[in-house]
Amino acid sequence: IIQSWSDEARSVALLIQGFDYLYLFIYPAWLALVAIALGTRLGGRWQPAGLVTGWVVLVAAPLDAVENYALIQQLLHGAGAAPAKLALWCALAKFALIAVAMGVLSLALCVWISRRLGRERASR
């Protein structure tokens, strides 16, 4: 597929990969901070869960960087089995880590909302 792209299409794809390098510094840091903040706010078992989730999601950044590198290599030098496999495995691992983190964050957010609503009802 890459070989059928024009030079302009490849340039655009390279630009998008460059922007993705900037984005990979934002989403892991944001998710990690939210995980740690929610864990701290909820306390108890949630505190270490938030800390572990924060660290786990930070592993997504280097996986994303390696995935981007492999994709850029294919854009510059043509499709190859090794870079394609590397990009695939890094992407799968990255999305698995993010999915786990989002699951923990969603559950923690539900607990936080539930506790907050419970306090409001109790204060009436």
Set out the residue ranges of the language-model regions.
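N-terminal hydrophobic alpha-helix used for membrane targeting or insertion
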Residues: 9, 53-56, 83
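Transmembrane alpha-helical segments in integral membrane proteins
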Residues: 22-41, 101-118
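Alpha-helical transmembrane segments of multi-pass integral membrane proteins
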Residues: 59-109
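Alpha-helical structural elements of signaling/regulatory helical domains
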Residues: 7-10, 44, 78-81
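Interfacial segments of alpha-helical transmembrane regions
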Residues: 42-61
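Extracytosolic (periplasmic/ER-lumenal) interhelical loops and adjacent juxtamembrane/interface segments
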Residues: 1-13
